[in-house]
Amino acid sequence: MARHGGAYVIAAVGSASRGDGLAALGADEVVVGLKGVGGPVDVVLDTVGGAHLVAAWGLLAPGGVLHSIGWASGEPAVFPVNSTFAPGASRTLRSFGDTTAPAADLALLVDLVAQGALRAPIGWRGSWRHLGGAIEALRERRVPGKVLLDLDRL
């Protein structure tokens, strides 16, 4: 979606194999870890949390925004003293918690998928009755892509 909106997209992954297919999805660069990101960057979407979130903060340009949208590491984010202060326009950290009605956003996503401008590869599909297995696969990082749960009858 960022690429669709005109952004230059850098996808940072935990291992080279996790980057397979990301260029085809719109990433201009795929790097392993944040050390490969030259910075500064305007926007970061972080799903890892912990030390990764702190490192991502350090990549922000003045006026940049870091969106914390997950906490896969399960570790605390500990910022060094004074690391959140810098000259220039303020940098911002936001957490995922928007509770506004998603209808308009979902309609946009459906439209982009219908146009072929947005793809969401499915890495695991199964009955909602196997939710535990799906969650385990996600936590163990065995799913490249999205999990799709089919709702069947009891």
Model-based region annotation:
Residues 29-33, 125-130:
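Short acidic-hydrophobic, aromatic-tinged amphipathic segments that line or gate anion-handling sites
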Residues 117-121, 133-154:
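C-terminal capping/lid region of NAD(P)-dependent oxidoreductase domains
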Residues 1-33:
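Mid-domain Rossmann-like dinucleotide-binding core that forms the NAD(H)/NADP(H) cofactor-binding site
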Residues 12-17, 33-34, 47, 70, ...:
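N-terminal Rossmann-fold cofactor-binding loop
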Residues 44-45, 67:
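N-terminal Rossmann-like NAD(P) cofactor-binding module of classical short-chain dehydrogenase/reductase
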Residues 19, 53-54, 132:
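Short, well-ordered alpha-helical microsegments
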Residues 37-44:
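A short acidic, Gly/Pro-enriched loop at the edge of an enzyme's catalytic core
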Residues 51-118, 151-154:
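Glycine-rich phosphate-binding loop and adjacent beta-alpha segment
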